[in-house]
Amino acid sequence: MGGPRAWALLCLGLLLPGGGAAWSIGAAPFSGRRNWCSYVVTRTISCHVQNGTYLQRVLQNCPWPMSCPGSSYRTVVRPTYKVMYKIVTAREWRCCPGHSGVSCEEASSASLEPMWSGSTMRRMALRPTAFSGCLNCSKVSELTERLKVLEAKMTMLTVIEQPVPPTPATPEDPAPLWGPPPAQGSPGDGGLQDQVGAWGLPGPTGPKGDAGSRGPMGMRGPPGPQGPPGSPGRAGAVGTPGERGPPGPPGPPGPPGPPAPVGPPHARISQHGDPLLSNTFTETNNHWPQGPTGPPGPPGPMGPPGPPGPTGVPGSPGHIGPPGPTGPKGISGHPGEKGERGLRGEPGPQGSAGQRGEPGPKGDPGEKSHWGEGLHQLREALKILAERVLILETMIGLYEPELGSGAGPAGTGTPSLLRGKRGGHATNYRIVAPRSRDERG
């Protein structure tokens, strides 16, 4: 994109006296501003970043004018926040080496004009260093500086070159105009409107953060003392009746009963038998014919039992009868009183050793430590950052010899690297290296 005229103007600017010094507008009242130099400072700030959500129980108010019998709750999804630490780089203006004071006008007597330039400082940071492979926090600053240089180079490559007015005295061939690269000095003197204003009033206090998350559950406490014995239980239900027992032996004979009353006259006929059957007739004085025999009368009461007869010959033993049916279960009685405790028995002989049991199931895996996981993620991030920095340096060609240094042929290097706008300010970039700890807001 750069033509021969642009290269010629650049070489003429280098040949002018004071070309490697700081830029200056030339105004006498602001000549002290050339002693100011820019420095890159790094700060670590904290910020809240949302990290998931959690459920929160919120008490609902009673919609009725009267008091409600119970409390009601509703579940609300609340965001969870954590604190992230960011490393922010900023540019500050301070006195150049050899100058001091409020306006950087006092020069030290023992110090001379500084011999370094902006390109020299960048050249010191562009030297590749051997990566040791130890991804710890000591390499963060080195990677940050290298990445910062890469971003500055990329910004210069993407800047659109503004048209340069034609200069008739410039040669067409830029090859003979070799020389050291131009040095970028400190920014030029600013006008009155560029003076730093007074600090403003502090801002209002921010809103109160959300309540923190609930802490982890505590450890289980020791078991409490044994309580007093409980009251005795109620009496049990009545059991089913028991089986029916066998029949008892016959009882002894009872005493003789009272004598029976005398029966009717026809009862005495039965003692001598029926006259028709026994061939006996009763003489009667009347000659009337005998009528039919009436129905028999009711049986008389049982007479007294006779005396017991002699004991008979004992009979042969009978066959054993089948067992009777099982009777219903009897009612269970009340439990008796608890007896006294017996004497302790002698210990028995020691038994033989049993067989070895099967191994138990494998336990659950333990929880991983949060510190180890975060350290591993930090190492992976540093490793990826180091690889990307090396790839970018290789693609841009930062380690090729500079134009005019004599280490390479003419025309090498990237001409558009030096297209920085004179008097312009470089864009501030921030490099973030997260280092978090969880917090709920």
UniProtKB/Swiss-Prot annotation:
Q: Which cysteines are joined by disulfide bonds?
A: 37-96, 62-68, 95-104
Does Transferase count among this protein's keywords? no
Annotated signal sequence is: 1-22
| Occurrences of domain EMI (ranges) | 33-106
Q: Which residues form a coiled coil?
A: none
In this chain, the stretch annotated as Disordered covers 162-371, 405-441
Q: Which InterPro entries match?
A: Collagen, Collagen/C1q_domain, EMI_domain
Q: Where is the composition biased (Basic and acidic residues)?
A: 335-344, 359-371
Say yes or no: keyword Signal present: yes
Q: Which residues form the Collagen-like domain?
A: 179-368
| Residue stretches spanning the membrane | none
Q: What do we know about how this protein assembles, alone or with others?
A: Homo- or heteromers.
Q: What is this protein called?
A: EMI domain-containing protein 1
* Gene of this entry: EMID1
